[in-house]
Structure formats: structure tokens, C-alpha cells
Curated annotation (Swiss-Prot):
It comes from Acidiphilium cryptum (strain JF-5). GO terms for cellular component: cytosol; small ribosomal subunit. Keywords: Ribonucleoprotein, Ribosomal protein, RNA-binding, rRNA-binding. This is Small ribosomal subunit protein bS20. GO terms for biological process: translation. GO terms for molecular function: small ribosomal subunit rRNA binding; structural constituent of ribosome.
Length: 90
């Protein structure tokens, strides 16, 4: 355990930020999972709706520093392609 006051404060801040980031990351994963589940069932309307809901959540994670911009872009691009392919086949 740290003896210096500033180090103790940093530990407290880190714990709070870690918990906050973990919650944000979990939320992003939940939104992505909803899109993937809708794709798996083959329901293109539900998949599109879930994808539209997931987009701002991923962007928010980038803004907050939870995800890197390229990671979010890659995830959105791949999900978009899968939703588009599902819509085209329906």
C-alpha cells in the first residue's frame, strides 16, 4: 500500500476509473451481442435496429477512451457488412 497521500489518491482514482471503464466495455459488448444474436436468428429488421442502437454506443466508448477509434471502426464495419448481407438475402 502506498504511504504518500498523492499515491493513495491515485489508487482510489484508478479503482473508480477501472470500474467505470469496465461497465462501459460491458455495455458495448452487450450491444454487439444483441446485433450478433439478431443476425444468428436471421431477422434482418431486428438486426438493423440493434445495429443502429449499437453505433452510438461504440462511438461513445471511443470518446471516453474505452476503445480505440480503429477498433470501433473495424467492429462497426464488420457488423454493418453482416447486417447488409442479411438484408440482401431476405
Amino acid at each position: 500500500m502506498a504511504n504518500i497521500a498523492s499515491a493513495q489518491k491515485r489508487i482510489r482514482q484508478t479503482l473508480v476509473r477501472t470500474a467505470r471503464n469496465k461497465a462501459r466495455r460491458s455495455r458495448v459488448h452487450s450491444f454487439i451481442r444483441k446485433v450478433e444474436e439478431a443476425i444468428a436468428t436471421g431477422n434482418h429488421i431486428e438486426a438493423r435496429t440493434a445495429f443502429i442502437a449499437a453505433q452510438p454506443e461504440l462511438q461513445r466508448a471511443v470518446t471516453k477512451g474505452v476503445l480505440k477509434a480503429n477498433t470501433a471502426s473495424r467492429k462497426l464495419s464488420r457488423l454493418s457488412a453482416r447486417v447488409k448481407a442479411l438484408s440482401a438475402s431476405a
